[in-house]
Amino acid sequence: MKPHDQFAKNYLEQLLSPLGTVEISKEVSDETRQIDLFFSPNPESNPDYLGLLGRIVLNTVLIEPYRNPPNRSEIRNCLAKLLTILAELQRQAKRENQSYNEDNAPRLWILSPSASLTLVESLGAKLDPDWPEGVYFLPSLYRTAIIAINQLPVTAETLWLRLLGRGKTQNQAVRELLELPQGNAFRENVLELLISWRVSMEINNILETEDREVFMTLSQTYQEWKEATKREGRQEGKLEGKLESIPRLLALGLSVEQIAQALDLDLEQVRQAIQETP
């Protein structure tokens, strides 16, 4: 899995888990396909604090985040996943002798860093006056919308989606994230995910120019994280400190090989630490 794909899934799971059930890489039955993220909200959840993202997840949704703008073939593949899920729900309702409520059926949200006018027009997608700029809805039959992240207004309401953008869009969002109060739980958790993404990109030597701009914004936080890791190692013993950090890095999506390289450990040391984790 590409570093950004892992980051996007972990990031959305971090934000949405308090609100309902999150399934990452959910398989659909017609063939070997996986939905990036399938979310079912808890009835009592109140996602208002997530702004536009919270509005999206008021009901059951499929979310497909893209690092690069999807082409028409990729969008058709997303639609196929949605149609498969809808067909499964219809069959389930029939088996259980229940009515199938189309209004409560899942929706598909495609998150793209940008969307060309040609693509939008080819999809028959339109802006909705009740939604911000950059949110394009396909004809209602398809229960699908595509969000051009770079077109979203720069407001607090869109912050959590703009963090999944690219280049200047993402860099601006990271700056806003850093300005949040340090006691903000999401601030700390998301920064940790961003730092993990940076480590993974550096290890794989796949930093792009626009990524470097974002990582420059994160540089001070990254240095603070490294210093904290060193202090932790000194306080608990150098090796013990490294071993303590393995479960956290694993949870953030780094592979065994990446963790070993980042912490300067043998692969066997990392594997053993993972096995001993409760």
Where are the regions that the model predicts?
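Short, charged alpha-helical interaction segments and adjacent helix-coil junctions
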Residues: 63, 147, 164-278
